Amino acid sequence: VTNTGNVTISGLVINDAQLDAAAVCPVTTLSPGASTTCTGTHTITQAEINAGTVNNSATAVGTAPGGGTTTSPPDTTTTPITASASLTIDKTAGTPSGNTAGSTIAYSFLVTNTGNVTLTGLQVSDAQLDGPESCPVTTLAPGASTTCTGVHTITQAEVDAGVVNNSATASAFPPAGPVVTSPPDTTTTPITASASLTIDKTAGTPSGNTAGSTIAYSFLVTNTGNVTISGLVINDAQLDAAAVCPVTTLSPGASTTCTGTHTITQAEINAGTVNNSATAVGTAPGGGTTTSPPDTTTTPITASASLTIDK
């Protein structure tokens, strides 16, 4: 502060509404031409950080010998504040509600404002969620966090793979500049595979009761596991040829009926029954083989013993 007049100024003070406390002046009386340097401190506000500048104006005020007040013209400083907008996301997967397609996984997303500016319009981007995420707040001050939630319905492809991989990011708008997006966070949730088949074998009525007669068999095969089974075949050593299956890939819960034929032998006629056992075999997504428990049919053959003599 400089006294640019021709009279002594006393009671010098600084008028600056943004100072934390009154400015400190080493002297408060100035002769004409004399100067002094006063000091003060301002604590930066979040609003100023969001704006990117601190604009501060001050005047000097003193009293002339006649008692009148003298005020300097104002002087203003503009101090730039570097904005740093950033977010993090910490994704957590809950326990799946089951291990079949249609089961669900609940996710939580802890989003934190790790920058120095207020962020608005918070959103979580996760393409696998069934619907929009739910965030209790969408405006975050620096250092603040919120936990958003969402649900994903498990697909058959994920059950077959044995895992649900899910990645998410958080994004929001800083006071100025482009949208800011967090690095992605990914969860890996294992899904327990359970591959199983059943077979229900049915024997038709024999075409006759002599060697060379035939029995038509049907095999109802059901995928009773939670993974897709492919390469389905029937293991039945007594069939004349490989069983025919209209489909060889079964989704969980799906069934197909395969068919095959057996030609009755003389030994079976002599025994009076045809005992026939079969299993269904398929391949699980991981490459392992799945075999059903065997199912057996017993088909009675009517014996007819007779002789003739021609003497």
Please tell me what each predicted stretch does.
Residues 1-311:
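Exported/extracytosolic protein signature
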